[in-house]
């Protein structure tokens, strides 16, 4: 009996029953971009996903993958050519829903599946070969683009309005952004600039007068939704809270989506 329970306690644990274990991306390892090993890992993971399909109702990556397999000659991953993997990867938004909530084979399971990280690995290989489109890479330069957007906010907001059908059609042809998508408007000034002019006038006649808060404005509040930060600032000042503002720069998520991992590390620092 003791031996039986010992074996049970050492069996592979199913993932997603507890918090999944996420391993760091070792993008500097020589095998990370090895074409043969990457292709083998793609096929291994796709085959496991094909046999499970628990993630069928998440992002479009999985329906694309399963449809391709079902329509292949032998209805298996081996019937797919490596060139067919790209649409599956392109549909992944790196939202992590599969890894965090659905997949039963994430670490600590022996299958060690991390679908988003694998998609990122494939994109990194595509980037090295020059197969990623250049426009999304430029759109990922959030701080540069947003500073221009704020500087010329009236013109940019007018041009990006969905009612401006001609310019939105041209924008769609150039960038691939659907003309029906409502794009965020730019502030007439950054929240950081607004804060510098309005950080004083704190109400010190309150029980909260000795408290301090830092507002991390994020790129969206700093460049697009200033009123969110303004509202928070007003509430905090009225309650006597001393406020500081910080916007060190874009978090780097757009660079992650474009597989620019060194730039992501740089932004994190």
Locate each region found by the language model:
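Iron-sulfur-cluster electron-transfer modules
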Residues: 40-46, 75-250, 254-269
């Amino acid at each position: 009996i003791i031996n039986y329970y010992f074996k049970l306690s050492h069996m592979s644990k199913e993932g997603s029953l507890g918090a999944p274990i996420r391993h760091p991306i070792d993008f500097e390892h020589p095998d990370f971009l090895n074409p043969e090993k990457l292709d083998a890992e793609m096929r291994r993971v796709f085959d496991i996903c094909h046999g499970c399909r628990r993630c069928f109702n998440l992002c479009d990556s999985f329906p694309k993958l399963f449809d391709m397999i079902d329509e292949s000659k032998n209805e298996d991953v081996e019937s797919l050519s490596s060139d067919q993997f790209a649409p599956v990867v392109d549909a992944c938004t790196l939202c992590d829903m599969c890894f965090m909530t659905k997949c039963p084979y994430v670490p600590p399971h022996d299958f060690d599946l991390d679908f988003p990280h694998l998609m990122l690995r494939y994109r990194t290989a595509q980037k090295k070969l020059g197969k990623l489109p250049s426009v999304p890479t430029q759109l990922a330069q959030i701080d540069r683009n947003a500073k221009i957007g704020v500087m010329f906010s009236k013109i940019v907001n007018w041009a990006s309005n969905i009612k401006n059908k001609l310019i939105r059609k041209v924008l769609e042809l150039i960038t691939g952004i659907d003309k029906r998508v409502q794009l965020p408007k730019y502030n007439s000034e950054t929240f950081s600039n607004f804060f510098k002019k309005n950080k004083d006038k704190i109400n010190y006649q309150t029980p909260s007068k000795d408290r301090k808060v830092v507002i991390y404005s994020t790129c969206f509040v700093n460049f697009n939704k200033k009123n969110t930060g303004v509202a928070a600032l007003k509430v905090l000042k009225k309650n006597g809270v001393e406020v500081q503002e910080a916007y060190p720069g874009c978090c780097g998520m757009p660079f992650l989506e474009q597989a620019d991992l060194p730039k992501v590390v740089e932004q994190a620092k």
